Amino acid sequence: MSDQIAPTLEQPLKRPARRRVNRADSFGGGLPLAVVAILVTLGGFWPTFFSRLDEVDAAHMLHGMLATGWLVLVLVQASLIGIRKPRWHRVLGWLSLPWFVLLVVTSCHMIILMMSATGGLPIPFEQAKIFGFSDVTALPLLIIAYVGAIILRKDRHVHSRLMSITLLAGLLPAVARFFYWIMVAMGLARVESVVGLDGLTEVRLEGLALAMHPTFVFVLLALAVAIFFDWKNNRLRWPFPFAFAWFAINY
């Protein structure tokens, strides 16, 4: 009997496996994505918005501040999780509700202005319909992602990735302009300054619709990288694949 027990007692005790916490995944990639989004927004809208704030009308000023503020909000939210301040994160999350509603309302207004005459100078429909289509299709994704993030807020993994998707859904205009200025530098597009009926100088971005191709490639590539790392770390859930399919179909 003792001979049978001895080997069992000599076996080392195994400790239960501890779940490894990936600190880099503090908010579904929201922290680095928000930083990139802010930089791209500043670069894309600097020539026509941030450097001309004294010439921007009230409607564009309000939307621009709300959209830029949303990027900062997600950055702060991701940072609060990173420094372990969940209470502040929740408070700021609920305060984001009226901000988001205003963002959606002004986004709809911007789409209407884009597809209509502004300052007596109508935007060519052949150009506007391509560029405007991306906003029309991205807006429902923005709403779905935010509402889903609120409803599924107790599922931290899904919640964080849905908030990251709100960044990408609202980033298309900035990314398009960012690539557009690169195309201008390469001589593939041009900028025209014309005086409207109201006497104000308007900047016309000829060929802006062509920038939508690298824009969608950029967004799809960002999502593909996010999906790969989630899959590699055995934490892949539905938000990123859903967003990838959404953008791919619309593209």
Q: Model regions: which residues?
A:
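Alpha-helical membrane insertion/targeting regions
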Residues: S2-Y251
